[in-house]
Structure formats: structure tokens, C-alpha cells
């Protein structure tokens, strides 16, 4: 315990009511957040002579200050605890690394509804189906639905400006409601209803209706229509046959846990309407010495209760681990959902099968993760040996991307002892430089990244500069001129240049901008980690550049042309069937659009060409 913290005096001031406490170190950083039914009793336990674990001993040794927030109820304390954990990310708490909201499939409330992927708040009018474990699962489902039930998936801006059907209609993936006469209102509404039933897990109803329609078409001698519906029936059956379905038809999340070598994996199965929608593995950040029970309890609390990213709650949650606060968690979730949420730890029947599946997936994912981590550790150890460093705990790499000097973006990617640390990847929009001046771009991004206060834990051991001698010289100059409080001499600056034919394995490394560089064997683990972080940085930079370029392209094409306001833009896009059609049009064709003069048509033509 810190010499400056008087635990005895502090405990005299603490109430026995429920609440949340925050522990701070000497630097004023929150290092632990906890909740208690009885604050005085819980906080007193930290200052006994025989502490429960080495982790608690290490925590107490750093306490400089404790703040307490009293709450009305335990439920209130539980919610506040997880909001504080998300806000402060304390190093001694178990932390859920990936807290992105889950994607849903959105069926809009338009006259001709569209299907789309949706994340975040549900403000738009329509229906939401899910959650799905990730964006890939949603995209895969949307692609499947497009083949079976061809309702539109295009943006409203495209749909409202079509004068002729797009390629999706030509290949049978859309009914073409954008163009009058291609599909009746009744037929489109029927396909939308099939989608609604299918996504709600009511496959039997879909099949019953389709079979009835097929028989009617056959009796009316509409054999082509009957054959089309038959194909639809077969497609639905192929999908449903692959899906293990529970007889209960309930919505539930199933959580399996595996723990080994100080790492935990929590695997969540998402089951809606009795069907497995998908699953996802989580690897929470676990401080050394943490008990598995704390990992599970903290994960479940963070997963469902944290702030604005609160998950969509199923009717039941299955766990393969007993929770000490199971009743409190169930009551808190029920209060949030406005309905009864059951938390069950000893299921039977189908539920037991689901739990076994989640447990198996957790164990498999953990083995894979530990194997990957072992490989990363070996590579970083090899790199430290090559660079003559005691160890490499953190690396950062920079790359620049642009098109002919325009829309320049710099990327910074971060690796730690476990590999890519994607939560800390950053992109920087580069401005105020001569177009195409990569040296100036590198100079700017390094000053923005390192010309400020940096926590000691965030100071990299190695900074990799993609681009060779010239870019390395820029980095050296920047660091020589930095006026910062942290140790700017700690990071090793390393330049990397590809060979003449830019093939992997022919990289040359530079410690200094002058003189000869050196190469590593193609099978060197140290080279492999350099290639990995360099490629990550390159991909991250290109991705940012493409987004920026697309944004500029989409907003500037027509909006910057004088004399073309919102109404004329809409008329041009509608008449030409979109921006691409307008780009391909001649001056004479543009001049035929109502409200467009010959002179304005020429201006539009040349603006789009250049």
C-alpha cells in the first residue's frame, strides 16, 4: 500500500450502503473499479494482513486514493461499475476488448422495403432482425436472401433516381420495383412477407405458402411460374436442412468459457427463434492472478450492461459457470429489458447440447489463440535479438498513401506482445504539403503522433518507417527536434525498403539514413514480423485513402458545378440513370435533360471529364 494513503482514516469515513469505488495510483490514474453491497465491509477486506491473491497485493500496493459513489440499490451499483470500467479501462480489471455493437438485418418501412445491414441505434422506421455475430454473417445472409427472395438492397438515393433497371434485376437478384411495370405491388409485398417470416425463423410458414402458390400456378397451367416457385422452395429447404433447430424456438445466448496459461476465451452462441444465428469468441484482457470466476462475472456484466453499446437481450442466458451474483445479474438485466431475463447454469436437453457446443468452441478458439501468440512471441524475440534490444514489447509502423498526390493519408499501426493491437490503429489526413511529397507527409504524421505527452506504457520500442533511407532521415530529423517530457531516445527507428522488384523477402533494413543497409534471410522470424506490421500499415493506409477518395468523388462530382443545384442534380441523375450514366453521356444528351441549357451541358460535361 502507498505510504501516503491512510487506510484506517479512510475506512472511518466509508458508509455501509451499496455503491461503487474507484482506486487511483500516484499518477491519478484509475487502476481498479469495483462494486459492493456493503462498501465499508468490501473496502476493509483490501487492507487485511492476509490478502486473497498476489493480484490484490499488487493492487493495494499502488493505491494512493479511493473515491466512493453511493447508490440506492445493488442493481444501480452494478450498472455504474460497468460504465466506469468502460470509461477508465483500469489495468487491474478484466476488460472486454471488443465492444462493438452487433449488426442486425434491417427491413425498411419504405413503400418498397429494402434489406440492409445496420449497426447502432435503431432510429430508422422498419424492422430489425438479429443480432448477428459479425458483419460477415450479415453479408452472407443478405447474399443468400437476395438469391431466394429478390427484394431490393440498394440505397434509397439510387432507388429513387433509376429510369431503367440495374444489373441486379437482369441477373434475377432484384424484382426491380424502381421501374414501374416490372413487378406488381402484390408480388413485391408477398416476397417481403416471405423475408419477414424467414428472418423470424418461421420457415415452415414460408414453405407452406410457397407450396400452395406453386400448386395454384400449376392448376392454372402457369408452368413457368410454378417452376420458378419450385426453385424457391428448393432453395429454402437447402438452407433450413443445414440448420440445427431447437424445439423450443426461444431466443437465448449461450456462453462457454475456457481458461489456460493466463488467457481466457469466452465463446457466445446467438440463438434466435430456436436457430443458431452464429457465434463469436472473445479474449478479455485478464490481469495476472485473476480467478476464473472473476473473469466470467466481469465479462458477462460488461457484455450486457456497458453504456450505449448495451446488447439486445435474449429471454435466457445459459452459462457453464456458477455466478456468485447470478440473481443480481438477472434482476439487473430484467430491469433494463423491461421483461423477465433468466440466467441459467444447469440446463438440460437441447440447452445442454448448446452449452457443450459453446464450451467446445471456446476451448478450440483458445488453443488457436495461444498457438498464434506463441508464434508472435517467437518472432518478437528473434527481432529483439537482431536489433540487439532486451525485448520488443511494442512496435509502431507508418505508411503513406495517395493518388497522384491527392487525398494523402498516413497510417500508424501498433503491435504488442500478442500481435496487432487494432484498437490503437490510427489514420491521419495530411494537409498543407506539396502534393506527392511523401517526405513532408511522413514529417507531419510523426510530429502529430509523437510531439505530445505519451504514457510510458505507450512508448514504442521500435518505430518502423516504410520507405527506406529518405523516410528514415525524416524520422531522425523529427525526433531530434522533439521537445517532449517522455524519453524520445527510447524508440529504435528502423527504415525498411523493398527490393527493386518489390517482392516480399527482398527487404533492406536501415538503422541510419547513410551507408549500406542489411537484409535478413527469407525464412527469418524477425523478417516475418517486420513484413506483417509493414503490410498491416500499408493496407490500413490504402483503406483510409480509398475512403477519403470515394468521399471526395461522391460529394464533388456535381455539387461543385456552378448552376447545378439540388433539383437539377436530381433531374440529371434520374434522366441518365445515375452518375455513371451521366459521365458517359455526350453534351447533346445532357442538353436534352429538362432544365439544362446547351451552355450548362458543356460545363457539366467538361467538369465530369476533368
Swiss-Prot record:
It is found in: Cytoplasm. The keyword Cytoplasm applies. Residues 16-94 form the GIY-YIG domain. It holds the Pfam family UvrC_RNaseH. GO terms for molecular function: DNA binding; excinuclease ABC activity. GO terms for cellular component: cytoplasm; excinuclease repair complex. The keyword Nucleus does not apply. GO terms for biological process: nucleotide-excision repair; SOS response. Its main location: cytoplasm. Residues 204-239 form the UVR domain. Keywords: Cytoplasm, DNA damage, DNA excision, DNA repair, Excision nuclease, SOS response. The UvrABC repair system catalyzes the recognition and processing of DNA lesions. UvrC both incises the 5' and 3' sides of the lesion. The N-terminal half is responsible for the 3' incision and the C-terminal half is responsible for the 5' incision. Belongs to the UvrC family. Interacts with UvrB in an incision complex. This is UvrABC system protein C. It comes from Shigella boydii serotype 18 (strain CDC 3083-94 / BS512). The gene is uvrC.
Amino acid at each position: 500500500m502507498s505510504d501516503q494513503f491512510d487506510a484506517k482514516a479512510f475506512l472511518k469515513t466509508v458508509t455501509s450502503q451499496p455503491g461503487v469505488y474507484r482506486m487511483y495510483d500516484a499518477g491519478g490514474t484509475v487502476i481498479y473499479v469495483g462494486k459492493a453491497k456493503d462498501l465499508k465491509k468490501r473496502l476493509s477486506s483490501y487492507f487485511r494482513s492476509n490478502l486473497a491473491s498476489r493480484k490484490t497485493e499488487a493492487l493495494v500496493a499502488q493505491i494512493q486514493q479511493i473515491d466512493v459513489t453511493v447508490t440506492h440499490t445493488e442493481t444501480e451499483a452494478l450498472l455504474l461499475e460497468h460504465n466506469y470500467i468502460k470509461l477508465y479501462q483500469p489495468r487491474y480489471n478484466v476488460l472486454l476488448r471488443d465492444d462493438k455493437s452487433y449488426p442486425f438485418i434491417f427491413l425498411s418501412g419504405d413503400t418498397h422495403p429494402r434489406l440492409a445491414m445496420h449497426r447502432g441505434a435503431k432510429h430508422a422506421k422498419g424492422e430489425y432482425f438479429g443480432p448477428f455475430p459479425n458483419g460477415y454473417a450479415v453479408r452472407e445472409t443478405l447474399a443468400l436472401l437476395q438469391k431466394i427472395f429478390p427484394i431490393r438492397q440498394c440505397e434509397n438515393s439510387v432507388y429513387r433516381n433509376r429510369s431503367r433497371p440495374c444489373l441486379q434485376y437482369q441477373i434475377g437478384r432484384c424484382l426491380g420495383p424502381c421501374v414501374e411495370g416490372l413487378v406488381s405491388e402484390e408480388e413485391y409485398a408477398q416476397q417481403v412477407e416471405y423475408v419477414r417470416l424467414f428472418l423470424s425463423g418461421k420457415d415452415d410458414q414460408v414453405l407452406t405458402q410457397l407450396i400452395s402458390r406453386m400448386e395454384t400456378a400449376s392448376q392454372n397451367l402457369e408452368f413457368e411460374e410454378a417452376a420458378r416457385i419450385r426453385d424457391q422452395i428448393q432453395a429454402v429447404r437447402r438452407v433450413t436442412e443445414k440448420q440445427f433447430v431447437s424445439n423450443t424456438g426461444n431466443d437465448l445466448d449461450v456462453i462457454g468459457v475456457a481458461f489456460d496459461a493466463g488467457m481466457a476465451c469466452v465463446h457466445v452462441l446467438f440463438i434466435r427463434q430456436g436457430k443458431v444465428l452464429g457465434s463469436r469468441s472473445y479474449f478479455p484482457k485478464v490481469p495476472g492472478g485473476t480467478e476464473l470466476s472473476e473473469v466470467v462475472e466481469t465479462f458477462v456484466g460488461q457484455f450486457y450492461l456497458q453504456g450505449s453499446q448495451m446488447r439486445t437481450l435474449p429471454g435466457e442466458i445459459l452459462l457453464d459457470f456458477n455466478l456468485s451474483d447470478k440473481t443480481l445479474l438477472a434482476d439487473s438485466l430484467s430491469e433494463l429489458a423491461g421483461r423477465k431475463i433468466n440466467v441459467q447454469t444447469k440446463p438440460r436437453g437441447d440447452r445442454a447440447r448448446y452449452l457443450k457446443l459453446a464450451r467446445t468452441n471456446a476451448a478450440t478458439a483458445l488453443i488457436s489463440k495461444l498457438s498464434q501468440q506463441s508464434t508472435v512471441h517467437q518472432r518478437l524475440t528473434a527481432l529483439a535479438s537482431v536489433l540487439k534490444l532486451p525485448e520488443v514489447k511494442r512496435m509502431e509502423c507508418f505508411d503513406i498513401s495517395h493518388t497522384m498526390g491527392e487525398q494523402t493519408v498516413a497510417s500508424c499501426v501498433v503491435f504488442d506482445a500478442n500481435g496487432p493491437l487494432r484498437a490503437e490503429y490510427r489514420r491521419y489526413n495530411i494537409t498543407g504539403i506539396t502534393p506527392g511529397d511523401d517526405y513532408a507527409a511522413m514529417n507531419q504524421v510523426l510530429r502529430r503522433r509523437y510531439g505530445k505527452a505519451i504514457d510510458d506504457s505507450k512508448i514504442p520500442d521500435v518505430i518502423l518507417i516504410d520507405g527506406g533511407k529518405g523516410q528514415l532521415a525524416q524520422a531522425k530529423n523529427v525526433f531530434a527536434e522533439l521537445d517532449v517530457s517522455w524519453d524520445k531516445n527510447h524508440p529504435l527507428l528502423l527504415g525498411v525498403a523493398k527490393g527493386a522488384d518489390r517482392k516480399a523477402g527482398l527487404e533492406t533494413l536501415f538503422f541510419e539514413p547513410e551507408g549500406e543497409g542489411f537484409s535478413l534471410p527469407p525464412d527469418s522470424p524477425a523478417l516475418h514480423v517486420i513484413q506483417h506490421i509493414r503490410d498491416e500499415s500499408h493496407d490500413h493506409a490504402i483503406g483510409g485513402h480509398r475512403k477519403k477518395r470515394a468521399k471526395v468523388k461522391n460529394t464533388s462530382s456535381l455539387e461543385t458545378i456552378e448552376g447545378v443545384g439540388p433539383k437539377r442534380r436530381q433531374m440529371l441523375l434520374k434522366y441518365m440513370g445515375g452518375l455513371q450514366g451521366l459521365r458517359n453521356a455526350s453534351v447533346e444528351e445532357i442538353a436534352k435533360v429538362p432544365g439544362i441549357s446547351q451552355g450548362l451541358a458543356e460545363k457539366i460535361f467538361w467538369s465530369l471529364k476533368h
